Amino acid sequence: MANLINGKEVSAKVKNDVKEEAAALAAKGIEIGLAVVIVGDNPASRVYVNSKKKACAEVGFKSYEYALPEETTQQELLDLVDVLNKDEKVNGILVQLPLPKQIDENAIINAISPDKDVDAFHPYNVGKIMIGEYAFLPCTPAGVMELIDSTGTDIKGKNCVVIGRSNIVGKPMSMLLLHRSGTVTICHSKTTNLREICAQADILVVAIGRAKFVTADMVKEGAVVIDVGMNRLENGKLCGDVDFDEVEKKAGFITPVPGGVGPMTIAMLMKNTLTSAKKKNGLI
């Protein structure tokens, strides 16, 4: 039976460390601020925005919400981003995705100052991740690394398999594992021998958005299994991309859904915002 990797506990430690550093900066008169922009009234986006504001309050940051109507034009949003780029109170800018269809998401991401791009989506920061000279780490992959480290697993030389090649998780995840000297394989919808590849993984990270896709016969005995997926079943329950009940019997460590990777994403967003404030004030 696998050991459970408790994302709530690990994320609480990350946030507590951020809170202590933020308090030390506040004592020097340095306030930290995160601007969160939401366009339209997507219920899921509203939940995410509220959780980010709550996390800011927990760690002692100021949060600034900008709620724009669904019909906002691309130029109007670009104008707001420009204002926030120049705002000294704002250390991080987060534009909640998805955006309405009339707005080009890439144009907005590219307009955010790389120094305030705490999601690490800007091409400049993506390039920095590629060469291993990063200030900001993409929040979900960075959170996954913290969870792997919490198990005491040494990534060096391990067979690491990432299922999924998205720009947000799969690609940067593979880079972070590679920078730690993992032997990395990326699998995707066109991979022909997926089962055989996964069964060799010492560390398996799954991020494809397909409920219970990874079954026990795809998992190596004693593997570390990180489930990034979040799917809602017909009965309303949440589940990941891994068949938890079956894989748990075979894995060495496994993340639950919910309560695994999810809490880490917001914790790492707080860490990136702190990093931005420290960089701005010449502390790193």
Cite the ranges covered by each PLM segment:
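Positively charged, low-complexity intrinsically disordered leader regions
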Residues: 1-30
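Short beta-strand elements in bilobed, periplasmic/extracellular small-molecule ligand-binding domains
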Residues: 34, 56-70, 184-186
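Glycine-rich phosphate/diphosphate-binding loop of Rossmann-like nucleotide-binding domains
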Residues: 39-53, 135-224, 237-245
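Short, well-structured alpha-helical segments in soluble
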Residues: 76-88
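Anion-binding alpha/beta catalytic cores of soluble intermediary-metabolism enzymes, centered on
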Residues: 94-155
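Short glycine-/small-residue-rich Rossmann-like dinucleotide-binding loops
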Residues: 98, 208-210, 229-230
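Short glycine-rich, flexible loops that bind phosphorylated cofactors or substrates
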Residues: 101-102, 212-214, 233-234
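Rossmann-fold NAD(P)-binding glycine/threonine-rich loop
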Residues: 106-117, 122, 126, 229-281
